[in-house]
């Protein structure tokens, strides 16, 4: 059932939870689509002028229970996860803290220049890997593993599910040849080796850049964490491997090594760490995490025909290529390694790098006093948003010489619920057009934000939309601040 098809009764459940918690009626409801990739959960932002929360609708009770219990447990340990405001498990609904809309992946994509990673993104990653041991060790010590779903531990059964997922939904559907029995023998050897590592810690399971939110606190990006409902007891190596070999993040190897070292330094404060023993198992867990991800890409992309999932495959193959050339595991897995070599050499899989025609989205800020920006492409498609109804920083003396790109103005506008809702609505409308334009092969879309002077609100809105769009595949974003450019000429 899609967002649009949500039964009125279920939406009313979320509204009731909001009103009971905040003692205020809901004024706006904003479905958030695509936030959780392949998940079946429905995510809705409910808000008033000053209040906001995220409502979740999901019909797998065991997974809901795991998320709710883990969230409360982690908060008791002082970890940065959303507060749970209210729940109604009989309807598969709960209400949680709104952590905003900026993920670690969006920051990485927005600040990126070619292969290099911006200092702001590196700093955020360092904070993330420093917090991870607190989840794994500190909070993992007294966690109630009985509520884990679908397994209490990353055990033989869990590993078998992941390996078979990879075999049947990726290798088979991608047409990679292999000897079934020989591959099963390698799977058995790999499983035995993985299970010989210490597995007495919390394994987050989906510890990757799209599940980490960033919020500005004292003008610095601070990480908050989501999507740990699949967590269970397991080895330390799995989660750091998930983060550093997150396919679309495409982190350079030298940065991966720096972050791994920083993680191990942080981990040493919580456990008696034998680094050589940790590294003995590390790359085996990297391989198994990559296989799990490829199985997911194959299931969503090859089987369900959701082709955008396949755009991550070339990045995963790049990781495999590096591993094949630089890492030798302590165990022999000849058939599996041959399958990997066939994958990285496959013309079919290499062809997945040919993405649809790129769409260029031109985002303008402007002053209504000077008229609308002109569409120089001749396409004529897009939006003009009027931001004059929003709170105006230009009326305050402290902001008069600043623009919507300056931190004090950004912080001021970020705190305005009306601005957040306006921006969420604009993103939703533009996202729908971007999807349609790409599907139909259009090359240009224009989005303009206007305000009184073209200095504060319109500049801020244009920058925020551009940051959001840069995280999308096959979209080039060009930002123009018309009035500011004319002032600087």
Sequence positions of predicted segments:
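ATP/Mg2+ or Mg2+-diphosphate-binding catalytic cores
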Residues: 295-353
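Active-site acidic catalytic loop and adjacent metal/ATP-binding pocket
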Residues: 40-46, 190-238, 250
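Catalytic cysteine-centered active loop of the rhodanese-like fold, especially the PTP/DSP P-loop
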Residues: 443-466
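An alpha-helical support segment within catalytic cores of ATP-dependent transferases
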Residues: 14, 19-22, 140-152, 157, ...
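Active-site activation/catalytic loop segments of kinase-like enzymes and analogous catalytic loops
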Residues: 164-173, 236-272, 287-303, 316-323
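ATP-binding glycine-rich phosphate-binding loop
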Residues: 28-44
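ATP-binding pocket architecture of kinase catalytic cores
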Residues: 44-161, 172
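C-terminal accessory "lid"/substrate-recognition subdomains
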Residues: 352-445, 485-488
């Amino acid at each position: 059932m899609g967002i649009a098809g949500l039964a009125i009764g279920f939406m009313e459940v979320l509204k009731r939870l909001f009103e009971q918690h905040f003692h205020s009626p809901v004024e706006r409801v904003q479905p958030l689509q695509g936030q959780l990739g392949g998940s079946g959960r429905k995510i809705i932002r409910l808000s008033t002028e000053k209040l906001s929360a995220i409502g979740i609708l999901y019909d797998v009770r065991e997974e809901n229970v795991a998320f709710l219990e883990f969230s409360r447990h982690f908060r008791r340990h002082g970890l940065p996860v959303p507060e749970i405001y209210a729940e109604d498990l009989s309807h598969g609904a709960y209400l949680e803290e709104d952590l905003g809309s900026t993920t670690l992946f969006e920051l990485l994509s927005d600040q990126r220049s070619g292969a290099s990673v911006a200092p702001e993104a590196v700093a955020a990653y360092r904070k993330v890997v420093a917090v991870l041991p607190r989840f794994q060790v500190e909070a993992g010590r007294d966690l109630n593993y009985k509520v884990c779903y679908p397994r209490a531990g990353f055990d033989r059964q869990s590993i078998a599910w992941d390996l078979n997922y990879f075999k049947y939904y990726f290798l088979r559907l991608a047409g990679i040849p292999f000897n079934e029995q020989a591959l099963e023998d390698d799977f058995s050897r790999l499983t035995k080796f993985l299970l010989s590592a210490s597995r007495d810690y919390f394994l987050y399971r989906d510890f990757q850049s799209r599940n980490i939110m960033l919020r500005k606190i004292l003008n610095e990006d601070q990480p908050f964490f989501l999507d740990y409902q699949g967590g269970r007891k397991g080895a330390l190596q799995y989660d750091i491997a998930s983060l550093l070999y997150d396919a679309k993040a495409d982190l350079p190897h030298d940065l991966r090594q720096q972050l791994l070292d920083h993680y191990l330094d942080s981990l040493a404060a919580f456990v008696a760490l034998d680094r050589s023993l940790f590294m003995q198992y590390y790359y085996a867990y990297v391989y198994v995490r990559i296989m799990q991800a490829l199985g997911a890409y194959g299931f969503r992309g090859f089987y369900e025909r959701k082709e955008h999932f396949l755009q991550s495959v070339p990045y995963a193959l790049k990781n495999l290529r590096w591993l094949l050339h630089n890492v030798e595991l302590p165990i022999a897995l000849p058939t599996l390694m041959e399958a990997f070599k066939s994958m990285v050499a496959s013309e079919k899989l290499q062809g997945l790098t040919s993405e649809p025609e790129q769409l260029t989205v031109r985002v303008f800020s402007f002053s209504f006093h000077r008229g609308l920006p002109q569409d120089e492409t001749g396409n004529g498609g897009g939006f003009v948003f009027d931001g004059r109804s929003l709170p105006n920083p230009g009326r305050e003396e402290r902001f008069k010489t600043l623009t919507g790109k300056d931190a004090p103005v950004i912080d001021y506008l970020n705190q305005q619920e009306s601005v957040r809702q306006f921006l969420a609505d604009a993103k939703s409308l533009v996202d729908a057009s971007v999807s349609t334009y790409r599907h139909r092969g259009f090359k240009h879309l224009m989005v303009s934000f206007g305000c009184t002077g073209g200095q504060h609100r319109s500049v801020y809105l244009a920058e925020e939309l551009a940051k959001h769009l840069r995280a999308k595949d096959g979209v080039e974003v060009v930002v123009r601040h018309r009035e500011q450019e004319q002032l600087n000429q």
